Amino acid sequence: GKSREMMRIVLNKAKSDPKRVALAEGTDEKMIRAAYQLEEEGIAEPVLLGDKNEITRIATQLGLSFEPEVVDPQQQSLEAYADRLYELRQRKGITRGEATDLVERDTNYLGSVMVEMGDADAMLTGLTHHYPSALRPPLQVIGTAEDANYAAGVYLLTFKNRVVFCADTTVNQNPDADVLAEVTKHTAELAR
């Protein structure tokens, strides 16, 4: 049906030009499985963020024989990312030390700065974090598209014979007419 056709189109498009995806919750079993599947099927180039030893241990325990790319804040220098975060947020009161601390201990900030600097094309997060705290770093670091004044969440529901896009059931509480109009416009563009 339409659901299967939609997924085939999306997967084929992804496989034709695999993107680097930072998985912020890189030590989570589901994220490691997702990284394996993304890499195995050529859908994307996953980059797991977190403790490399823990990620390797979990992957082995799951019987996954792959060596994912890992950015481990405890084993790698993240100075360039801290510098960039400081540049972006210093006028909002963040110190250089706080920027270093954020990229070293909060993989949502690390992944967001990686995307902002072009070291990743996208970031996947929100599985184990409280939604607002998972959304805050990307909004602070990456922001919204140039033609967007508001961020919004979109869910894609696939049924046997149809596909439904549910826009902004997660971000804007009690949106006014302007927010609804913009979210509707951008969701329609996404659906096309």
Sequence positions of predicted segments:
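Anion-binding alpha/beta catalytic cores of soluble intermediary-metabolism enzymes, centered on
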Residues: 1-192
